[in-house]
Amino acid sequence: MNFLEQDQLFLENINQDNVVSAHYTSEYDNNEKEKSDDLKNKLVHKNISLNIHNIISSANLCIDINLRLVAVSIRNAEYNPSKINTLIIRLNKPQCTALIFKNGRIMLTGTRTKKDSIMGCKKIAKIIKIVTKDKVKFCNFKIENIIASANCNIPIRLEVLAHDHKEYCNYEPELFAGLVYRYKPTSNLKSVILIFVSGKIIITGCKSVNKLYTVFQDIYNVLIQYKN
């Protein structure tokens, strides 16, 4: 059986390999759900939805990887070391893109849940194991960034907000229509928020769903004070 056939067989049977990952994710999601339910409920009566668009995560396979070997052995792979010495692999299920580095580090982007992020990283680990025949160890998985958006359904007086919160804000409407709000109440909770006059916002920098909802609730409480 060649590498392509092995890869296809793995992908067809991946659900069996994801049992551990699914249980782990379920436990994590339950804990996150318990912590953030109160915040979510507060948003419901305001008719506000917070939408996650992208989760960027990372993991380590604890081996050095022959990127060229992997690139010529599987489909949906790109490797151009003259531009960047990184292998790019695209998966359809879950739909995501992985950057694989020679030192075994994986960066995954394009998923919207932690469950899919773990599944995507583990699929990449399996593919690397099949192709290289090396002993792959999947470890150090973590979420690096969550990108989300929401519509607060209120017009915002950005000029006044920028003046009152100038230590946190950067607002240059002649260059960019949005106000950049650097939220950092603690060293463990920080985010960059783009705020538009329409009330739409984009939140980046959070590393958990619970922190994302905390940031949104805090910034919403600020924004309602500047309703136009």
From Swiss-Prot:
User: Where mainly located?
Assistant: nucleus
Its gene is TBP
- The name this protein goes by in its record: TATA-box-binding protein
Name the GO terms of the biological process aspect: DNA-templated transcription initiation
Q: How does it assemble?
A: Belongs to the TFIID complex together with the TBP-associated factors (TAFs). Binds DNA as monomer.
Q: Which organism is it from?
A: Plasmodium falciparum
Gene Ontology CC, one term: nucleus
What keywords are assigned to this protein?
Answer: DNA-binding, Nucleus, Repeat, Transcription
Q: Which GO terms describe its molecular function?
A: DNA binding
Q: Does the keyword Nucleus apply?
A: yes
As for what it does, the entry says:
General transcription factor that functions at the core of the DNA-binding multiprotein factor TFIID. Binding of TFIID to the TATA box is the initial transcriptional step of the pre-initiation complex (PIC), playing a role in the activation of eukaryotic genes transcribed by RNA polymerase II.
| Source species, domain of life | Eukaryota
What the entry lists under InterPro entries is as follows:
TBP, TBP_CS, TBP_dom_sf
Protein location: Nucleus
